[in-house]
């Protein structure tokens, strides 16, 4: 815009109006205020004046210098950690020279030289700006480190001062904090002021020439030096404050120790003596180092300081200052030598105890010197005035006696505390860790959860030492999805086998592990159940997998177990490949499936996500090759590797008890190589691998990474999901397995003991709660776990499912005997009872039910629980009666002559008496007559005589509401 006055021209030049007025007056242009008009002639005069003042001549108008300035902002953290915005200004200057026709070549060379100089100057300034930014960042980093060091030292200082008095500590900390904050604030304000001054100088220097810029650079160097000096001063002030605080803390600790020693001396109780004596002379307060007494070793008096600390023999001679024994006997009262309480006390004091420095020398009436010294020595015991707080390490399980020993108290004290807490325990009772820690805190000590002397630490040490070469391994792919969406059929088409036909009801109830050789490589598949009862089994599958293939039916969409599978995959951080199955069906809708999956957070690649969507058909085989290609592509991106020449490690996929083979476990090798004959440890089970079969039932000698195998030879059935590891010898495996078994048993018993009182109160509050005891035997560990969880979910407030026992294997006589004792029903899931068990069950009337589909087992147990529910009682109004006349009959009472106005009246019905439509009595009919004859019922429109049991206050005009109570069966 055109600048018509001084203020507008100053704004255009980005300079103060006052400075512009001074320059105009120096140029001979008389302008008094900012609002005065400014002409082009005035501007030309000002320009000539400025050129002359800077050394330019009128004839030299061939060269024009342009200065350009660019300002940007960067984020930089200061010493306090806060982000601050720093403005960075880059200046560029270019000189243009007007060419002459005569010396055009020379002028061009000069212009190039000038441009080269300008470029060099620009590079130099950019380098200087970059160095300044680096220096600022380095200074900020040093300030942060210094602040962290100061905070760390401040925390240590506070920890050392915790024993000091609260008020003094708080006041001194506040004073120190204020002083340090004031110094730091002063240093920061000084640095900020210097930076602001530097910024103002840079702003003012923007309108000056290259000479002014050189001066500004020198000034910035001086400012940096000043900032550095300010930081050094702040650091010295902080160090000085810290030294002062440490000196104050030391003096305070010494003063407190001296005060504590004086308090202990003043609070020491005097011992009872027979003879009244003068009070002893005051003892000098001990030094702080001498104030540390224990329960067994009181602080020594002044006269005993010269005695050596080593123990003396029992028969050592008394010191030279001790009077003869006869002199002490002469001062005894008559009868004092006959076993009075004074002699008993002296004998007890003479017993040699651990920590006693007297060596067993009698310090009582016999051993003391005559007169004053004797009585002074007898009153030197100092009882501890402050409780001794011990740090008690509490293991997972501990007996009452061991816990008392750890706290140096009698077991009876612990039993008293337990009785106050409502628990009756014995000295050998095992307590769990939580209860034991509560008792320790109750007795005034500090409880710490102890680290176990765990032999499993050897496993961790062994793992750190393995340094085998990492080689590529096949991917482990878990097939997940809703029930009946075609997971097993899809895998069946890949394996070219009929697996789904072998599953009961066409649904998968086990985890199947298979490895498939494809033209593109080996893939290991885990087929998980889709039924809602197998949540834990699906979680184990997601834990052991590398890639999840999510099978969704094109005609069904996203279902509850589909959402659960997505949650398992996301929790494990596993990539998902979506297989949209059943695309051959006429009602398949791929777009709807994609939209539903996008709502669950699974976005297809064509929508910008990272999950491949592959339409497949397990029936026709369409899309199978694309699915395998996408799976192997994901595996290639993951770069899966595992050591091969190393001891094997893996996870238990499934476990069962075979009648002929014993415990059988299906494991997935995750690292190393498992060979036949290796010693394996899986949870609480261990043993040597006697036989190893692949998924087709064929024997194999070894299994590498990502290969599933079935092993035999374990000591018991391991839990599904347990980690499998190969150990060098059987002794170590047995030691760790037995340790785990004992730990599990102790923790279980301790928790049962802790829950006894709670369960007793619960049973008292529950009242009439029906229990359905069940014994569950299944073929594999996963099915047993799923069935137990599904049945426990059926429990309600009125009927509760009680799992008496659950295990893997066939139904034996022990199970029948347990069912007889607990009156339980035995459920066999894919198992059968042997001949002896069946015969025993028939003789004892035990119900054994067999199932092979989890739906049926859950439904029948639910029906049995419904039968145990108390029936619901409902009232049905059968008729209304109006009282027309009341008769008083001796020995009977009031008899109402009535008219049945609605419904029917039966002799066995109940009745409510209504007066003015308000219920005044509810009871039963005592008699129902018609013309002096007893009748069973009277219908509408007939008259009858009625009497109500225990109610004679019948008035004409009353109404009788006749009703019956019926019971209705309830369902869950």
Swiss-Prot record:
Residues 48-85, 99-385 are annotated as: Disordered. Residues 617-619 are annotated as: G5. It comes from the Bacteria. Residues 481-488 are annotated as: G1. It is found in: Cytoplasm. The keyword Membrane does not apply. HAMAP family: IF_2_B. Belongs to the TRAFAC class translation factor GTPase superfamily. Classic translation factor GTPase family. IF-2 subfamily. PANTHER family: TR-TYPE G DOMAIN-CONTAINING PROTEIN, TRANSLATION INITIATION FACTOR IF-2-RELATED. One of the essential components for the initiation of protein synthesis. Protects formylmethionyl-tRNA from spontaneous hydrolysis and promotes its binding to the 30S ribosomal subunits. Also involved in the hydrolysis of GTP during the formation of the 70S ribosomal complex. This is Translation initiation factor IF-2. It comes from Burkholderia lata (strain ATCC 17760 / DSM 23089 / LMG 22485 / NCIMB 9086 / R18194 / 383). The lineage of its organism: Bacteria, Pseudomonadati, Pseudomonadota, Betaproteobacteria, Burkholderiales. The gene is infB.
